[in-house]
Amino acid sequence: MKINLNTVESEFKLIESWNLTHKQKALVYYPKEIKELRIILKYLKKNKKTFFIKSGSCSYDGKSIGVKKSNIVISLRNLSKLIEINKKNNIVNVQAGAKIADILLELKKNNFSMFAIPGGEHITIGGAIAANVIGKDSSQNFGAFGDTIKSLNVMFHDGSIKNFEEN
């Protein structure tokens, strides 16, 4: 099946921040694959549309819904795969929509954990990176969440992907 903007799951809905202080109506796209995300981004760029990306919607201050900057939202909830646990190098490869709670369950099966563990079962990797969250007492010993990232693939508005690695 050919993928185009019409084949990507989407809906008009009322979205709310985690603390329910921010609400807005939005067109929400739910890409299931990287190529669907690329199609959405290219369309939005071509048509000069502003948008906001969200994952778990756990931001206390409304950042998870864009605080009325745009009425187009791209939800990463379906881009949530735990791709690999590399035991030799102590590295986990996941997509941005992966929930911290799900990752911790898989890590526990392999006798691993994470240095920075934010509270809340719906917090996603993408949100944790975007907010550079900290876990209770972890920032004193290990730094913030961003300090544990070894590499990051970022898709830009034009659909191109760039890898950023720790120096």
Predicted segments with their positions:
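FAD-binding subdomain of flavoenzyme oxidoreductases
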Residues: 116, 121-122, 128-167
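Short secondary-structure boundary/hinge segments and terminal tails
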Residues: 61-62, 124-126
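Glycine-rich N-terminal segment of FAD-binding domains in flavoprotein oxidoreductases
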Residues: 18-118, 132, 137
